[in-house]
Amino acid sequence: MHNYENEGAGQLPGEPFTCAIQAEKYGPAMDLALHQAALSAHLGEVPVGAVVINDDGEVISQGRNRREELNDPTAHAEILALRSAGVKLGTSHLEGCTLVVTLEPCAMCAGAMLLARLKRVVFAAWEPKTGACGSQRDLVRDVRATHRLEVLAGLRQRQAQALLEDFFAQRR
C-alpha cells in the first residue's frame, strides 16, 4: 500500500500546497468534520465526517457516516452533508460551496459533488483503495466532465488517519 503522508506536502504533483492558508481557512470546518467522524466511530460506523461551508467559511451543514444505522449503502458522510445543504439552501446546486471531509471521497460521493457543482473539496486522509479525487481515480478534475472541482488534500491528515486506524484496530 502506498503511503501518501507528506507526499507532495499533501497535494498531488504539480499543485501548490497552501497548508497555512488551508489551516486558517478550512481548519475550523475540518475540526467539525473530525468531531463528526469521532461520533461515527463511537456509534459503530466507519469514522468519516463531512461539513459543507460557503465562501465565507459559514457552516451550512454537517454529516457523518450512517450506513449501518440507516441500512443504506449511500449514507456516506458526504452524501448526507450535501443533502442537508441542498435542503437548507433550497437548491441542489451548491456553487461557491466547499465540502470539507475527513477521508478522500469515493466515486459515488465524487459524482454527487460534481452534480452539486461544488467549488472545491478539502479532505484530510487519502483513500488509496477507493478514492476518486486523486488516488485511485480523479473524477472531480476529469477534463471530460462538465464541471470540475478544486482539490485540497492533507489538512489534519494524521488526526483522520488515527481515527480510522483506531476504529479498525478495535474490530480485528
Could you tell me what each predicted segment is?
Residues 1-43, 59, 108-172:
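Zinc-dependent deaminase
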Residues 33, 37-40, 50, 61, ...:
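Small-residue (primarily alanine) positions within well-ordered alpha-helices
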Residues 44-48, 95:
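Short, basic and Ser/Thr-rich N-terminal targeting/leader segments
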Residues 48-57:
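Short beta-strand scaffold segments in enzyme catalytic cores
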Residues 60-67:
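Short beta->alpha transition motifs characteristic of CBS
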Residues 67, 101, 125:
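Residues that line or immediately flank small-molecule/substrate-binding pockets and catalytic motifs
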Residues 69-80:
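A short, polar/charged loop-to-alpha-helix boundary motif
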Residues 91-103:
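Immediate flanking context of iron-sulfur cluster ligation sites
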